């Protein structure tokens, strides 16, 4: 698949276009221009390194939303075996913005749950752009409870702009569904490893992310609101999104410094979409390390750690009154 370049990557896009042009000429020419192609390829790689070494939070947010970025089912195919998808919340409907099912991780039975976006217009609409409704979160809760019943570790993958804000979602109890998930996750007797693979949007992300270990990919984001939404509230214009992204502290390194996530998994040069297989290999290693850390831990300790993490989200400091 041809790489789609973001706006800030245009200098790289121009170099890559030139390289492709020269390769096309090379195929039909007796003149050897391989040395020039190699020179431009090295220049493109160095430019990518330089650009990605100084990314702003707003640029990171754009990478997290990249249309070619691996989604949950891509990681399921690369990391797990024997995946069998389970459907429906047994109450209302089957929300396709959340996928989940039984699988094996390094031969061990487990439960996998995650947000799923679409690759084309039809699939994006079918999966509601990764914005889950109450029935999606209730499906996730059902699968978590099933895993808990059979003693299976749970792996969740977060990639959502946020919970769906439509009227019908509110009518069916969106906030109750999210809140109930937090309650259930806090009390699970099995390890839960959560990974932010793209966008981690507010309560819609947290609803499947109260884990014993929270992993975040290098160019993923995690925040209480999107930069555009924040800018629209504070400055009354979405054009201030870059400033909002800076203020939100949504990048992996910022969140790790704040103690809100546990581990950062580096991405291939140019982002996970440049080499999905390499990304999956690195993530699988991190998941295995996290699972080893918590497997065999006493239930009471798992629950206490999770409750402590949940209570640590959002703090305030008394400054005195006038």
UniProtKB/Swiss-Prot annotation:
Pathway: Lipid metabolism; malonyl-CoA biosynthesis; malonyl-CoA from acetyl-CoA: step 1/1. Belongs to the AccA family. SUPFAM superfamilies: ClpP/crotonase. It holds the Pfam family ACCA. It comes from Ralstonia nicotianae (strain ATCC BAA-1114 / GMI1000). Its EC number is 2.1.3.15. It catalyses: N(6)-carboxybiotinyl-L-lysyl-[protein] + acetyl-CoA = N(6)-biotinyl-L-lysyl-[protein] + malonyl-CoA. Disulfide bonds: none annotated. This is Acetyl-coenzyme A carboxylase carboxyl transferase subunit alpha. Keywords: ATP-binding, Cytoplasm, Fatty acid biosynthesis, Fatty acid metabolism, Lipid biosynthesis, Lipid metabolism, Nucleotide-binding, Transferase. Residues 39-293 form the CoA carboxyltransferase C-terminal domain. The lineage of its organism: Bacteria, Pseudomonadati, Pseudomonadota, Betaproteobacteria, Burkholderiales. GO terms for molecular function: acetyl-CoA carboxylase activity; ATP binding; carboxyl- or carbamoyltransferase activity. Component of the acetyl coenzyme A carboxylase (ACC) complex. First, biotin carboxylase catalyzes the carboxylation of biotin on its carrier protein (BCCP) and then the CO(2) group is transferred by the carboxyltransferase to acetyl-CoA to form malonyl-CoA. InterPro entries: Acetyl_CoA_COase_a_su, ClpP/crotonase-like_dom_sf, COA_CT_C. HAMAP family: AcetylCoA_CT_alpha. One of its GO terms (cellular component) is acetyl-CoA carboxylase complex. It is an enzyme of class 2 (transferase). One of its GO terms (biological process) is malonyl-CoA biosynthetic process.
